[in-house]
């Protein structure tokens, strides 16, 4: 087994090798590489499959009690400065390796069906493999410098994949927005890393925590400075995990192809922020103000994401705001000291949210056969309905994911979310109440999505409904790449003339198999965290923490907390059923009764508008003023210098006439002038 640990560096290198080989092929032999599309896909999937096998073996060995393993080499040295690079395999990294490789493998299989007709099929696989390599490198990083390197690489891959369809303006704008927003958090992270090194002289997670605590307790370092440095580091996870106020990029990231929405923006990259908080736990935990900041940031983000998701009509954006909300739960858990609970929810959420996103892609794939390849129409739930009849596998898997995220037992989300709420009640009842209310909203908007998409009658052939959607957005149809028939771009003509069917269809096996595979952990994996026999907590717990099991499990307390969680979820489900399935209440009446709240949710709390006015328009105004200064002052000074040189040159050229007696006269005049001046003084 020691050989496996010594070769663990291959886990991130294998997908990197796949991406490199295919990438070189695309650059050097583009046409030939694209013709061998499925061979390239199988090659990349095989590389990742090998990484999954190695990751699974490492996780199993860690479960059996193998000690943590670290392999380091000295990368840079100058005097007392030593920087080491390498990898570490411990309980947390082994778990994350399996999560990343398993979800990535299923997403790559799914991609073969979803991107089958896209001309960028091979390029997409190369990007996916590069991302998988970067994410795997991140989770085995032993220090902050290496984390930061891979942190930026996953950000770059996110940029490439969000803007994959770069000829669509919305996608090009979205990848820039994601990149710029994440740079704000990453700048804070970089400052925090440098500040912590200045204070402690180390980049190692555990060493930083020990030394920082010692410096603060001895009075050498101010507690306020330590808190500021820790909060600067936390800015990185705030951006990467889409926490308030840097959450605005994630919904726009849905402009990328759906497989990357599942892999990057639901299961792995956005969870990297929570992972970094876990790694930095020895630094954060001793500083109460930092822990409170983390807890309340997560709590407010969970509430914010849920309130916006209530009114979303785009199926992917609804899931995006749901992701923001669930990430808020994880961050809140880390802030209240519920280390194990936060990471448990990270694991369960990775599987059921990846499945939900892939289900949404399956729905979009089916809808495109009816409404065409305009993402506005193909993704809007108002023209779906009744899809359970046509897409039973997708509908069943989406229902499983919905029950899991709503916290209905025995599905995975119940055990992880209920544990967070129970510990939040012990830490701060206010945090519990907000989380509890958010759980009710989660149940409402998720079943709203399910009922609007899969129940009732199919509305995809209703031209009036489609026109209403286009009118709502105030946009003309915007057909994206991937249309299989040029005639499909003619939106106004009838469907029969364009090869469109009048009914959606179930997706191929390459797309439905990953859904069914992800449904298994979405149902069963939560049982690892049963509170009376919490195997997950026994395996994953905070550094230095000793897990103590109570002699007797408090069933009464469990029934009260679980009953509250299930009760609020059932209320949310019931309200959604009455509105969107049984149609006992008209949601429009409620929107008209509370127009301010409805508009607040529909307009995403106006954060995009506020940021546009403050930062986008504000920076443009500043840029225009700087341009005026540059034009009038800087350019004026430069031009004036040139003018003075020109005029003086024009004047002086007449002195250079080539006559010696004229030069002698000038010399005589100059000498005479000096004599007169000195005689007077």
Swiss-Prot record:
Catalytic activity: a plastoquinone + NADH + (n+1) H(+)(in) = a plastoquinol + NAD(+) + n H(+)(out); a plastoquinone + NADPH + (n+1) H(+)(in) = a plastoquinol + NADP(+) + n H(+)(out)
GO cellular component, one term: plasma membrane
InterPro entries in the cross-refs: NADH_UbQ_OxRdtase_chlpt_su5_C (IPR002128), NADHpl_OxRdtase_5_subgr (IPR018393), ND/Mrp_TM (IPR001750), NU5C-like (IPR003945), Proton_antipo_N (IPR001516)
One GO MF term attached to the UniProt entry: quinone binding
Pfam family, one: Proton_antipo_M
GO biological process, one term: ATP synthesis coupled electron transport
Domain of life: Bacteria
EC number: 7.1.1.-
Membrane-traversing stretches: 7-27, 39-59, 89-109, 120-140, 144-164, 188-208, 219-239, 258-278, 289-309, 327-347, 352-372, 395-415, 420-440, 509-529, 558-578, 660-680
Keywords attached to this entry: Cell membrane, Membrane, NAD, NADP, Plastoquinone, Quinone, Translocase, Transmembrane, Transmembrane helix
NCBIfam families attached to this UniProt entry: NDH_I_L, PRK06590.1, PRK07376.1
Family statement: Belongs to the complex I subunit 5 family.
Function: NDH-1 shuttles electrons from NAD(P)H, via FMN and iron-sulfur (Fe-S) centers, to quinones in the respiratory chain. The immediate electron acceptor for the enzyme in this species is believed to be plastoquinone. Couples the redox reaction to proton translocation (for every two electrons transferred, four hydrogen ions are translocated across the cytoplasmic membrane), and thus conserves the redox energy in a proton gradient.
Official protein name in the record: NAD(P)H-quinone oxidoreductase chain 5
Native source organism of the sequence: Synechocystis sp. (strain ATCC 27184 / PCC 6803 / Kazusa)
């Amino acid at each position: 087994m020691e050989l496996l640990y010594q070769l663990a560096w291959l886990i991130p290198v294998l997908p990197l090798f796949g991406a490199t080989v295919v990438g070189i092929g695309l650059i050097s032999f583009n046409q030939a590489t694209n013709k061998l599309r499925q061979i390239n896909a199988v090659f990349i999937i095989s590389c990742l499959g090998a990484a999954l096998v190695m990751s699974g073996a490492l996780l199993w060995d860690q479960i059996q009690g193998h000690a943590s393993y670290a392999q380091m080499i000295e990368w840079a040295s100058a005097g007392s400065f030593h920087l080491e690079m390498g990898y570490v395999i411990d309980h947390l990294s082994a778990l994350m390796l399996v999560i990343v490789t398993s979800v990535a493998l299923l997403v790559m299989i799914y991609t073969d069906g979803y991107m089958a007709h896209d001309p960028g099929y091979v390029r997409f696989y190369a990007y996916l493999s590069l991302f998988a390599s970067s994410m795997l490198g991140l989770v085995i990083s032993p220090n902050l410098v290496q984390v930061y390197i891979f942190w930026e690489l996953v950000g770059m891959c996110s940029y490439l994949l969000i803007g994959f369809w770069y000829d669509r303006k919305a996608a090009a704008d979205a990848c820039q927005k994601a990149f710029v927003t994440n740079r704000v958090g990453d700048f804070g992270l970089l400052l925090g890393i440098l500040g912590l090194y200045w204070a402690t002289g180390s980049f190692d997670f555990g060493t930083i925590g020990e030394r920082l605590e010692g410096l603060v307790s001895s009075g050498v370092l101010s507690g306020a400075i330590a808190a500021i440095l820790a909060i600067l580091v936390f800015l990185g996870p705030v951006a990467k995990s889409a926490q308030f106020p840097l959450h605005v990029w994630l919904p726009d990231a849905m402009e990328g192809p759906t497989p990357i929405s599942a892999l990057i923006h639901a299961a792995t990259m956005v969870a990297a922020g929570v992972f970094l908080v876990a790694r930095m736990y020895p630094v954060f935990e001793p500083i109460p103000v930092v822990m409170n900041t983390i807890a309340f940031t997560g709590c407010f983000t969970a509430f914010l994401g849920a309130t916006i998701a209530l009114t979303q009509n785009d199926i992917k954006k609804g899931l995006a705001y749901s992701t923001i909300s669930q990430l808020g739960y994880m961050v809140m858990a880390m802030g209240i000291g519920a280390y194990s609970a936060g990471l448990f929810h990270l694991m369960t959420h990775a599987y059921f949210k990846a499945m939900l996103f892939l289900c949404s892609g399956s729905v979009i794939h089916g809808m495109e056969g009816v409404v065409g390849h305009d993402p506005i129409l193909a993704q809007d739930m108002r023209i779906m309905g009744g899809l359970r009849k046509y897409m039973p596998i997708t509908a069943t898997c989406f229902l499983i994911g919905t029950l899991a995220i709503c916290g209905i037992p025995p599905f995975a989300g119940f055990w992880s979310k209920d544990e967070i709420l129970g510990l939040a009640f012990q830490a701060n009842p206010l945090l519990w109440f907000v989380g509890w209310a958010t759980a009710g909203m989660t149940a409402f908007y998720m079943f709203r999505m399910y009922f609007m998409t899969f129940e009732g009658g199919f509305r995809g052939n209703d031209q009036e409904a489609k026109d209403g959607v286009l009118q709502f957005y105030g946009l003309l149809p915007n057909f994206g790449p991937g249309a299989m028939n040029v005639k499909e771009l003619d939106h106004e003509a009838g469907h029969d003339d364009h090869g469109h069917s009048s009914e959606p269809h179930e997706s191929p096996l390459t797309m439905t198999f990953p859904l069914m595979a992800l449904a298994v952990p979405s149902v069963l994996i939560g049982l690892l965290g049963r509170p009376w026999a919490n195997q997950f907590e026994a395996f994953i717990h905070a550094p230095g923490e000793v897990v103590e099991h109570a002699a007797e499990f408090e069933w009464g307390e469990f029934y009260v907390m679980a009953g509250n969680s299930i009760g609020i979820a059932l209320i949310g489900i019931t309200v959604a059923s009455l509105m969107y399935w049984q149609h006992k209440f008209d949601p429009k009446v409620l929107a008209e009764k509370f127009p301010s709240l409805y508009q607040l949710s529909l307009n995403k709390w106006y954060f995009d508008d506020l940021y546009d006015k403050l930062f986008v328009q504000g920076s443009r105004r500043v840029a225009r003023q700087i341009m005026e200064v540059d034009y009038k002052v800087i350019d004026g000074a430069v031009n004036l210098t040139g003018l003075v040189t020109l005029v003086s040159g024009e004047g002086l050229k007449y002195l250079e006439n080539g006559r010696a007696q004229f030069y002698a006269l000038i010399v005589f005049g100059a000498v005479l002038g000096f004599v007169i001046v000195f005689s007077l003084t």
